[in-house]
């Protein structure tokens, strides 16, 4: 079952400090101690408020791109889906999140080698996953 939560129509703007200095995930490097700008995640993740929804991921078919069960996806129903996009698709009345393949033939590719690529006869795209949030520390 797909659990959909509409994005706030008029979200409260919460701008937090954005450090332009990148933080390496490899060898340590001194990071700047000051913020260069501000960032509001609503502005960053949501392109069209009226057509954007939050959808909670279930399962592990997309683990190889860092999308795990329980993660929150930001999905835009109005965005046109292109080859390679991560999409929410409907197949036989069931929803799934997969990578959209348009060539050589339309299909839905899991991002986990334990799941096969699906080539449905009737493929309905519900929306394009614009971003997702993965908590690194517990809690809903």
Over which residues does each language-model region extend?
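Flexible, small-/acidic-enriched active-site or ligand-binding loops
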Residues: 112-118
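Structural motif
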Residues: 70-71, 85
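Short, positionally conserved secondary-structure boundary motifs
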Residues: 1-63, 83, 94-95, 102-106, ...
């Amino acid at each position: 079952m797909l659990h959909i939560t509409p994005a706030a129509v008029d979200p409260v703007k919460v701008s937090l400090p954005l450090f332009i200095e990148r933080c390496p995930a490899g060898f340590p490097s001194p990071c700047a101690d000051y913020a260069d700008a501000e960032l509001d995640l609503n502005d960053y993740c949501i392109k069209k408020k009226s057509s954007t929804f939050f959808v909670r991921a279930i399962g592990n078919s997309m683990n190889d791109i860092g999308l795990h069960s329980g993660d929150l996806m930001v999905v835009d129903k109005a965005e046109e889906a292109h080859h390679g996009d991560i999409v929410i698709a409907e197949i036989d009345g069931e929803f799934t999140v997969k990578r959209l393949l348009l060539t050589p033939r339309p299909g839905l590719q899991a991002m986990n080698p334990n799941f096969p690529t699906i080539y449905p006869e009737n493929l309905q795209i519900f929306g394009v996953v614009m971003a997702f949030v993965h908590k690194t520390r517990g809690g809903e």
